[in-house]
Amino acid sequence: MRVAVLGAGAWGTALAVLLASKGVPTRLWARRKAQAEALKAMRENRDYLPGVALPAYLYPTHDPEEALEGAELAVLAVPSKALRETVAGLPPAPWYVSATKGLFYGEEGVRTPAEVVEALTQRPVVALSGPNHAEEVARFLPTASVAAGPEDLARRVQALFSGPTFRVYTSRDRRGVELGGAVKNVLALAAGMVDGLRLGDNAKAALLTRGLKEMVRFGTALGGEEATFYGLAGLGDLLATAYSLHSRNRMAGESLVRGVDREALEARGVVEGLYAVKAMVAWGKEQGVELPVAEAVHRVAHEGLDPLAALKALMAREPKEE
């Protein structure tokens, strides 16, 4: 089997390294020609995963035709804001694995990355999601993930990616798996604000617990199964993202406390939570569903509210039964 990995950031590179280390011929497509040439010459992704050697079975390329030639499937590991453009601009693959985490909101309502890819390509899509930091996957530290989609294809993804340090579970709840992976980025932004304000462990535990409740409320209303949000793709991913030094979203929350604005954060790299929170809040307002943590994050990130004022407002909400 030959695999194309589309997207040569940290996550795409880590997945390509994982596959190639198992002897799977893997072509890693980089959007920028200069990056592809550097990957070939240095056998290392110094921009996104410094110190990780590229295995012999990993071949970087800037040519989309070359990347997809003979590939049985394509793994999509691009930022959500670039997903539509990337898929529309590349030759189709027989089927896809979406490793992108994010949300889309428009006239059709809330859509997940796999749903967007499926609509654009009319090909089957499996979502791969979980508490998976690229830095740890690429260094073969123990990791678990979830492959969600059509049962036969999810099992093929399970077999393809599973190994001594990467354990894959299957799920039929693709929508729930993807919603969990998107919402946890919003909650990680909030956790980063708590860290930046030095509000302590009690505050962070309370925020994340209530945030998990919000994830379940949002996710089940959109068709996800409640159990999914208490598994690897929900709670598991939330824990990894909200506490990790690797987490771009948690660090972005800290940066917002220090006065770094949204535009400056986006210039440093994609912060998926900044996009997902817009979709969550827009949907919540349309449906009349309360999402207080997401609304607080939105007010800080997109409306300029002081982070401490936003968190104080959460504490001042009307008392209620848990």
UniProtKB/Swiss-Prot annotation:
Q: Gene3D superfamilies this protein is in?
A: N-(1-d-carboxylethyl)-l-norvaline Dehydrogenase, domain 2 (1.10.1040.10), NAD(P)-binding Rossmann-like Domain (3.40.50.720)
Where does the record locate the signal sequence feature?
Answer: none
Catalytic activity of the protein: sn-glycerol 3-phosphate + NAD(+) = dihydroxyacetone phosphate + NADH + H(+); sn-glycerol 3-phosphate + NADP(+) = dihydroxyacetone phosphate + NADPH + H(+)
Q: Which UniProt keywords apply?
A: Cytoplasm, Lipid biosynthesis, Lipid metabolism, NAD, NADP, Nucleotide-binding, Oxidoreductase, Phospholipid biosynthesis, Phospholipid metabolism
Query: Could you tell me one molecular function GO term of this UniProt entry?
Result: NAD binding
- Domain of life (superkingdom): Bacteria
Q: In which pathway does it act?
A: Membrane lipid metabolism; glycerophospholipid metabolism
- Which GO cellular component terms are attached? cytosol
What function does this protein fulfil?
A: Catalyzes the reduction of the glycolytic intermediate dihydroxyacetone phosphate (DHAP) to sn-glycerol 3-phosphate (G3P), the key precursor for phospholipid synthesis.
Listed name of the protein: Glycerol-3-phosphate dehydrogenase [NAD(P)+]
Organism per entry: Thermus thermophilus (strain ATCC 27634 / DSM 579 / HB8)
